[in-house]
Amino acid sequence: MIKVKFAVIGNPISHSLSPLMHHANFQSLNLENTYEAINVPVNQFQDIKKIISEKSIDGFNVTIPHKERIIPYLDDINEQAKSVGAVNTVLVKDGKWIGYNTDGIGYVNGLKQIYEGIEDAYILILGAGGASKGIANELYKIVRPTLTVANRTMSRFNNWSLNINKINLSHAESHLDEFDIIINTTPAGMNGNTDSVISLNRLASHTLVSDIVYNPYKTPILIEAEQRGNPIYNGLDMFVHQGAESFKIWTNLEPDIKAMKNIVIQKLKGEL
């Protein structure tokens, strides 16, 4: 059996759970593939082609802070990644690098499994960065009501082509009770960041509050929503499903999503 080599590049990268998750999948499928975390500082990124080539990598994930920086090094980029302006998955095929973005489809695939009737949901997305755009692009394909995206600065919407409602955060705060799902894509609530992105005072009791962060397991917005009695949903499924979609792109095989999710949960529980 040919051993296929995969990786994730970023900086910092030592705390990435991607190698653990992908190896659980390889083991479940009896594959002898490998997956390693490669730390690539910004000042060494110009050598990325050499770094990947020397390690004979067949496909790799791209994480912070390189999701936009990788684009000029690609030979081709699919429409979804081009629209988002960020790449998190690269397929190395016949010496060519092809870029994809699986963050949006990863999040939506997970959300569909826990939210019945998503097609008719009124959805508010907080933040207008790459993650927001990727999720909005995927939701736009399946949700009938017009999506609403809120951001602190309206200039972030200048390169958005989707037909959506674009509002500022204060407007969003005063209309929170109109939404069935609220998705936070801003960095507020990540480890060490206790900023609150928005006031939940007008939150309706049925609204699902979600955050794309999975570490910490519950961000401040999720803790507050849960204390109010609202259902909450973190970014764990997004992390698992984006990895699963990357694996499909690299191998054309179906991943063992359950094995991938279980190992990440076990690891997080050990760290909490």
From Swiss-Prot:
- Any signal peptide, and if so, which residues? none
Checking CDD domains in the record gives: NAD_bind_Shikimate_DH
Enzyme Commission number = 1.1.1.25
Q: Name one GO cellular component term.
A: cytosol
Q: Name one GO biological process term.
A: shikimate metabolic process
So which domain of life are we looking at?
Answer: Bacteria
* GO molecular function list: NADP binding; shikimate 3-dehydrogenase (NADP+) activity
Q: Does the entry feature the keyword ATP-binding, yes or no?
A: no
InterPro entries named among the record's database cross-references: Aminoacid_DH-like_N_sf, NAD(P)-bd_dom_sf, SDH_C, Shikimate_DH, Shikimate_DH-bd_N, Shikimate_DH_fam, Shikm_DH/Glu-tRNA_Rdtase
The entry's keywords: Amino-acid biosynthesis, Aromatic amino acid biosynthesis, NADP, Oxidoreductase
**Amino-acid positions noted as binding shikimate in the UniProt annotation, renumbered to this chain:** S16, L17, S18, T63, N88, D103, Y214
Positions of NADP(+) binding:
E79, G127, A128, G129, G130, A131, N151, R152, T153, M154, S155, R156, I212, G235
Catalysed reactions, as listed in the record: shikimate + NADP(+) = 3-dehydroshikimate + NADPH + H(+)
Name the SUPFAM superfamilies on file.
Aminoacid dehydrogenase-like, N-terminal domain (SSF53223), NAD(P)-binding Rossmann-fold domains (SSF51735)
Q: What is annotated as the active site?
A: K67 (proton acceptor)
- Pathway entry: Metabolic intermediate biosynthesis; chorismate biosynthesis; chorismate from D-erythrose 4-phosphate and phosphoenolpyruvate: step 4/7
Tell me yes or no: is Glycoprotein among this UniProt entry's keywords. no
Q: Which HAMAP family match?
A: Shikimate_DH_AroE (MF_00222)
The protein's job, in short, is:
Involved in the biosynthesis of the chorismate, which leads to the biosynthesis of aromatic amino acids. Catalyzes the reversible NADPH linked reduction of 3-dehydroshikimate (DHSA) to yield shikimate (SA).
Q: How does it assemble?
A: Homodimer.
Q: Which family does it belong to?
A: Belongs to the shikimate dehydrogenase family.
Name it.
Shikimate dehydrogenase (NADP(+))
Underlying gene: aroE
